[in-house]
Amino acid sequence: NLGLLYHRQIAPLHIFGARILLELGGATAAFFIVYVVLFCLKQVGLPHNYLLLYSGWLLLAWVSCGFALILTGLAMRYESFERLVSLISYTLIPISGVFFMVSWLPPHLREIYLYVPFPHGVEMIRAGVFGEFVPTYYHPLYALAVGSIFNILGLLLISGARDRISVE
């Protein structure tokens, strides 16, 4: 993708934006396909609250986008950090709350765990799909604020590292 930077109108942020949209589209398609299959197998019903489902999805995308921009900015600045990105990404999968519910945690651990911004979007999606049948814990304003900080910090890191990009 760096070859596109030969063109004057294309900036690094355009490439990152396209990659983020591609990831979001792929994740959305995967979620939709799995949900349709489970719906056809009568394992899930229609979502109870579409607005909460979509809000959680967008909130999760917002926080993830910001975190990805931070990782990208750090990888652009420090070559050794580039090797850690996949390790960090794979570590975040179980921490995100996809494989377990926040309600399963003891209250004192739940409070600490909810400082991680990713589970808030996942819990909102869970609440939108299952409704009152599943207890959920989330604070959308907290995750929105952390996502905003992530995005601003990520954009600053990328803009500051722009001179470190070498087009071969």
Roles of regions detected by a PLM:
Residues 6-10:
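Short helix-to-coil transition segments within interhelical loops
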